[in-house]
Amino acid sequence: MSMVYINIFLAFIMSLMGLLMYRSHLMSSLLCLEGMMLSLFIMMTMVVLNNHFTLASMTPIILLVFAACEAALGLSLLVMVSNTYGTDYVQNLNLLQC
């Protein structure tokens, strides 16, 4: 396994650990999720290019489309929560809270 794959895997793990540790604010959670998607995109692109998978060449582009949709929904949720409650705490997203 080359050093590039190890670095990208470590970037994914660091983003996952950031998502698990800093989950009180919605903005930091969205940023960690974007880091995970970016490292996953780079890893998929490198695997497709190195192994010459012609049938799977569209897979990284499809992942980017889903990442863009996730980012748009996350930012709209962030704007809605910050306009409603004044903060971006994740605890405000609990629908069962009275």
From Swiss-Prot:
| Entry's EC annotation | 7.1.1.2
Keyword annotations for this protein? Answer: Electron transport, Membrane, Mitochondrion, Mitochondrion inner membrane, NAD, Respiratory chain, Translocase, Transmembrane, Transmembrane helix, Transport, Ubiquinone
TM spans (from-to): 1-21, 29-49, 61-81
Give GO cellular component annotations, separated by semicolons: mitochondrial inner membrane; respiratory chain complex I
Q: Where in the cell is it found?
A: Mitochondrion inner membrane
Q: How does it sit in the membrane?
A: Multi-pass membrane protein
* Gene3D superfamilies attached to this UniProt entry: 1.10.287.3510
The reaction(s) annotated as catalysed by this protein in its Swiss-Prot or TrEMBL entry are: a ubiquinone + NADH + 5 H(+)(in) = a ubiquinol + NAD(+) + 4 H(+)(out)
GO MF terms listed in the record are:
NADH dehydrogenase (ubiquinone) activity
Q: Per the record's keyword annotation, is GTP-binding included, yes or no?
A: no
The top EC class, named as a word, is translocase
List this protein's GO terms for biological process: ATP synthesis coupled electron transport
Superkingdom of the organism of origin:
Eukaryota
Q: Which PANTHER family match?
A: NADH-UBIQUINONE OXIDOREDUCTASE CHAIN 4L, NADH-UBIQUINONE OXIDOREDUCTASE SUBUNIT ND4L
Q: Which family does it belong to?
A: Belongs to the complex I subunit 4L family.
Q: What does this protein do?
A: Core subunit of the mitochondrial membrane respiratory chain NADH dehydrogenase (Complex I) which catalyzes electron transfer from NADH through the respiratory chain, using ubiquinone as an electron acceptor. Part of the enzyme membrane arm which is embedded in the lipid bilayer and involved in proton translocation.
Subunit field text: Core subunit of respiratory chain NADH dehydrogenase (Complex I) which is composed of 45 different subunits.
Q: What is this protein called?
A: NADH-ubiquinone oxidoreductase chain 4L
